[in-house]
């Protein structure tokens, strides 16, 4: 039983004149249905979230960013109705570290995930766990790359980090008829045809089901392309680029330009395919009348050098590697008039920003910044720099290939980094967008270099980052690495050790 003191005027909105106050005793039998309906209403007012994460899509490769070669009409339309965070970066530009920061809101030296193919702590407070606790349905489709038990192994529910709906493979770069596992079954299944197309169909089915639910949802779609191999998109998209002359970045060495142009055709074909699927997902949300209260995020885990500075793939601090597309579409909060934001959003900032937009308390474990008030225009953006880093080079940028540890700051206009030996790179990204003129050590830029060094030290102090040699962190976290200081992922058992054959 519960006592509630009200007046007839409050109950029926009558004038209080000549009415005397009355006290009523309401039983919980009467009140509970009312309270439940309020809870359901509040839940329905929470935004849905469709988070589209692609792999290795650099920021410069969209029509809306000014690229006249790649065909991305659906993304261009989405950008015209969204906030385009033009300075979004992947602070540790490689797959697993970005995904761990996305899930935890933490920097790599806090969650321990600073290399590929290591396990994100199953006890971590993660994005899906927080949303699930707040009443959300949670789902994940596609590439995971946070399990650390080899790339083809079944991931049991205890390592699914709070996602209820689950169609996932740890990692593959075969984008046609690749394998996946569902939530509680170790039976290997296969996507039908091109993975991104089949996964999109699964998203559409999920949205149909969620339209019948009173709960909001968080659905993450993680697409493996346009990461290499570049030439495996469906023919209907490859034909757009056949024999097409492609603009190649000026920082690509002459000896690589023919290869890079050919690879870029395939890279763009993957993108145009994905773009078409994004159009389907948007149309489904509109058909279900869910578009206005659904936050759509489109972004990538990192970029792709694709020949720039003589390298492919990522890890390095150049623009093509660290800068990622980042569109956030939320009509109920932002309207549908597109805008461009200079906010320096980094990988750990995504979780708190989504929580802020969803009016969910941010856990104390989160280190990233909540940009929701900035995006809504309620606060001024006071962030002047953000941290970029490589804690331990490995794989395609192992030491024998020139890989090295670095720490740096990105301010939008400037990129500054130092390695273990001292200042390494300084670029003015406005006057030198392809970063071909290193300003380190030039007398006329000494004041700028000192200012950026001070900013870097401030960021390192915030993170308690001592900037040690990479193997010190490998030993601290007890990771097993091979002769190239890379975590092995082929023939690995559940303790993370290679299987002796």
Per-range role (PLM):
Residues 11-13:
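Short hydrophobic targeting helices and cationic amphipathic motifs
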Residues 465-481:
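Short, charged, surface-exposed hinge/linker loops at domain edges
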Residues 430:
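A short, internal acetyl-CoA/4′-phosphopantetheine-binding micro-motif in the GNAT/acyltransferase core
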Residues 20-30, 38-419, 424, 433-454, ...:
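Formylglycine-dependent sulfatase
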């Amino acid at each position: 039983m519960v006592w509630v003191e009200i007046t007839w005027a409050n109950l029926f909105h009558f004038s209080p004149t000549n009415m005397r106050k009355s006290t009523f005793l309401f039983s919980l039998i009467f009140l509970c249905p009312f309270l439940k309906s309020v809870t359901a209403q509040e839940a329905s007012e929470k935004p849905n979230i469709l988070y589209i994460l692609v792999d290795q899509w650099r920021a410069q490769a969209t029509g809306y960013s000014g690229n006249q070669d790649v065909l991305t009409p659906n993304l261009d339309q989405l950008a015209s109705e969204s906030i385009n965070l033009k300075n979004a970066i992947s602070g540790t530009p490689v797959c697993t570290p970005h995904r761990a920061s996305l899930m935890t809101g933490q920097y790599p030296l806090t969650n321990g995930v600073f290399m590929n193919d290591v396990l994100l702590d199953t006890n971590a407070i993660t994005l899906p766990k927080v949303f699930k606790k707040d009443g959300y349905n949670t789902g994940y489709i596609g590439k995971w790359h946070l399990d650390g038990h080899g790339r083809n192994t079944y991931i049991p529910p205890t390592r699914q980090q709070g996602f209820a709906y689950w169609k996932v493979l740890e990692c593959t770069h075969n984008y046609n008829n690749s394998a996946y596992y569902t939530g509680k079954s170790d039976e290997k299944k296969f996507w039908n045809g091109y993975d991104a197309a089949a996964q999109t169909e699964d998203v559409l089915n999920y949205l149909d089901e969620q339209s019948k639910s009173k709960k909001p949802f968080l659905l993450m779609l993680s697409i493996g392309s346009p990461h290499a191999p570049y030439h495996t998109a469906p023919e209907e998209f490859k034909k757009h680029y056949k024999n097409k002359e492609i603009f190649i970045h000026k920082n690509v060495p002459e000896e690589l330009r023919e290869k890079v142009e050919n690879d870029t055709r395939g890279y763009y074909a993957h993108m145009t395919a994905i773009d078409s699927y994004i159009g389907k997902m948007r149309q489904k949300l509109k058909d279900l009348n869910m578009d206005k209260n659904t936050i759509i995020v489109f972004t990538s885990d990192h970029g792709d050098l694709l020949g720039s500075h003589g390298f492919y793939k990522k890890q390095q601090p150049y623009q093509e590697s660290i800068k990622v597309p980042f569109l956030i579409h939320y009509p109920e909060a932002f309207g549908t008039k597109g805008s461009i934001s200079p906010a320096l959003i980094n990988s750990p900032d995504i979780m708190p920003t989504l929580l802020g937009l969803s009016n969910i308390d941010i856990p104390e474990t989160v280190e990233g910044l909540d940009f929701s008030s900035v995006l809504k225009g309620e606060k001024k953006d006071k962030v002047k720099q953000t941290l970029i880093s490589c804690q331990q080079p490995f794989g395609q940028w192992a030491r024998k290939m020139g890989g090295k540890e670095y720490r740096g700051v990105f301010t939008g206009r400037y990129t500054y980094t130092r390695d273990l030996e001292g200042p390494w790179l300084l670029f003015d990204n406005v006057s030198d967008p392809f970063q071909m003129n290193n300003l380190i050590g030039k007398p006329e830029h000494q004041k700028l270099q000192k200012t950026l060094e001070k900013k870097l030290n401030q960021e390192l102090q915030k993170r308690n980052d001592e900037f040690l040699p990479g193997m010190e962190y490998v030993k601290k976290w007890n990771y097993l690495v091979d002769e190239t200081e890379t975590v092995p992922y082929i023939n690995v058992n559940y303790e993370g050790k290679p299987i002796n054959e």
